[in-house]
Amino acid sequence: MAKLSCSYFLVLILVFSAFLMVERAEGKRCHLTIDKATACSLSDCRLSCYSGYNGVGKCFDDPKVAGPSNCGCIYNC
């Protein structure tokens, strides 16, 4: 019976450590506005975000910044 309980305990520890490793691997997401001065071109935005930050670029309207739509880059911090 003691060997069986020890085996269950070992399996439980392994499963728990696997969950902890998955949480650390996900990371946090960061957002950065690229080139606020010019209007956003979706293809240029995606290319600069991917090449500079290995992220995904999207055009969006920012109420804090006057003018045309901006390029936003979402990437893993």
From Swiss-Prot:
Disulphide bridges in this chain?
Answer: C30-C77, C40-C59, C45-C71, C49-C73
Q: Does the keyword Disulfide bond apply?
A: yes
Gene Ontology terms describing biological process: defense response to fungus; killing of cells of another organism
Record's keyword terms, sorted: Antimicrobial, Disulfide bond, Fungicide, Plant defense, Secreted, Signal
Signal sequence interval, chain numbering = 1-27
Q: Which InterPro entries match?
A: DEFL
Q: Where in the cell is it found?
A: Secreted
Query: Pfam families per the record?
Result: SLR1-BP (PF07333)
Task: Spell out the protein name for this chain.
Answer: Defensin-like protein 159
| Native source species | Arabidopsis thaliana (Mouse-ear cress)
